[in-house]
Amino acid sequence: MLSRRIFIATAAAAAVPATAAGRVPRVVFLDPGSPAPQASGPMSRAAVDFMTIAAAQLGIKLEVLHANHDHLLMIRHAQAVAARAEPPDYVVLVNDKMAAPAMFDALAPSPARLFVIHSDVTDEQRRDTGNERERYPRWIGSAAPDNTHGVFRLVQALHNALGARPIRALGITGPHSTPVSNERARGLTDYVASVPGARLEQLVYGDWSELDGHRKAWVLLARYPEANLVWAANDEMAMGALQAASGHNAPVVVGGMGGWTRALRSIADGGLTATLTGHHLIGAWALVMLYDHANGIDFASDGGLRRKLDYLHVVTRTNLREYENTFGEHERPIDFRRYSKVYRPQLARYDFSFAPLLARLN
């Protein structure tokens, strides 16, 4: 899928005359995941996929260094980048396992500017690091999906599927050491708290894997036989939970996050009820802003230095076809130059929302 997406997007870019030919920035992405399909979640691969497409279209030299889910290797990559005789212009990194401050320190000798995506530096960490462009002046910005509001909408869709039954919810989020796990879980707890009579039976931490999702859900469904809603913080764990529900013959609705191909097929077949998608675009949106920054347009003037992008999209059987027309096997290419103020000087504000994207491509 990666090579096909890149071929289509690159061909489309070549077919459309560019309206700008700015400076070509060099960007290194310190990916916490792995390039191996069996070792990295589909969302991680898709994020790199769309960053590669965006870089090719915009005119960015992108290099990806994979850490294989080892935060110490991620820090060593940062140290190696800082020691380069020819440093990149920008380094994009993820606060996976709370490692961003260590990478800030590792990259301090480098003139490269730093941009955090996906998993933000937490408020607690910021008491030591300060905010963007303060203690670390070359840390120029951050952008992350608004996971809390996105999960709130996802659980609302699961609730709608329950009909009149009162919510008896179970939740499986990611590792405690990863800030995004708690952000996603907060969407579940916020929604349950907003509904009179709803109850969250238990929320547990997982390791993002389908096997762990199955194990956790199997135990929880046995412990809470009245549970009727299972939320998981990614599609892999959701698929495992769905298998556990089938094994228990439990009448539950199950939702995940990521837009994984198997999850979409499961929704079409009446298995999963919903998934929350769009995380795979956060790196591409960051590259749009960095390209503009490299060419004299500072994104800080439009949305600030620390951005929570509330664009995540709930997919159910109702809107599955529309979503697959854009991101499925027969996807239409996204032209990321349309979102750049360098390529489109008429843009007054960045708009990274999902609805216009779907409308434009369908």
Give short role names for the model-derived ranges.
Residues 1-12:
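N-terminal secretory signal peptides and thylakoid transit peptides that target proteins
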Residues 25-50, 54, 63-76, 94-98, ...:
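Extracytoplasmic "Venus flytrap"
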Residues 68, 73-128, 237:
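Beta-alpha junction/loop-to-helix N-cap segments that form part of ligand/metal-binding clefts
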Residues 74, 135, 140-168, 259, ...:
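Hydrophobic alpha-helical segments within soluble ligand-binding/sensing domains
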Residues 85-95, 113-118, 170-171, 203, ...:
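Periplasmic-binding protein-like
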Residues 106-148, 263-266:
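Flexible loop/hinge segments that line or gate small-molecule binding clefts
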Residues 114-127, 231-273, 281:
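Venus flytrap/periplasmic-binding-protein-like
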Residues 172, 285-362:
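Hinge/cleft segment of the Venus flytrap/periplasmic-binding protein
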